């Protein structure tokens, strides 16, 4: 295994993919750096290093696409198109609530809010707690680190990407071809491909309801990034006919 994916995604490619993230209209201007991304990937050595070069590039494209959707500042007539505006934000927009759920293992810290932050917009105390434990940072007490420290921010997104949360597989295992659907997955239409990753992330809102703008936006980012990285996006890109997990 290579411990570094910079041989596949150079700083120049990273800038082409996330071309407008430092636009003055973006709330996270200057936050998401290439160096922070590469540093964070070293904590998750299998990311972007599993399988052949085509598979590795597809994983990078899929990760950056899903997280670009979560952080997009794009709109239909945006300069260079809506899929050039990923990584525009590092915290949930509007007036988000506390996102505090009852948990013995990961109790909420007084006065802290666990709304969406970072590339995957990690939410809820139980995700902040588990992610922090995995990367060695106390995020229950310091959730704002995910919007203030770019390396920590990328690490939370990579933790979510690499970690299976039953009954869901990890996005990593799906995109690298290591997930084989069970009978319980196949019957509801959950098949390997980019679409089931959308199901993992937000299936309850976006899947099994035909075509919708949110799901299609994720696919749009993925197609653009695959084109830049020179890989075929593969089959089963949507989850229109997939029932959510669980």
UniProtKB/Swiss-Prot annotation:
Location(s), subcellular: Secreted, Extracellular space
Cited Pfam families: Glyco_hydro_19
EC number: 3.2.1.14
Catalytic residues identified in the record: 70
Catalysed reaction, written as an equation: Random endo-hydrolysis of N-acetyl-beta-D-glucosaminide (1->4)-beta-linkages in chitin and chitodextrins
Induction behaviour: By fungal infection.
GO biological process: cell wall macromolecule catabolic process; chitin catabolic process; defense response; polysaccharide catabolic process
Enzyme class: hydrolase
S-S bridge residues: 26-88, 100-108, 207-239
Keyword Metal-binding: no
GO molecular function, one term: endochitinase activity
Cellular component terms per the entry's GO annotation: extracellular region
Alphabetical UniProt keywords: Carbohydrate metabolism, Chitin degradation, Disulfide bond, Glycosidase, Hydrolase, Plant defense, Polysaccharide degradation, Secreted
Function of the protein: Defense against chitin-containing fungal pathogens.
PANTHER family per record: CHITINASE 10 (PTHR22595:SF111), CHITINASE-RELATED (PTHR22595)
Family according to the record: Belongs to the glycosyl hydrolase 19 family. Chitinase class I subfamily.
Protein's name in the database: Basic endochitinase
Organism placement in taxonomy: Eukaryota, Viridiplantae, Streptophyta, Embryophyta, Tracheophyta
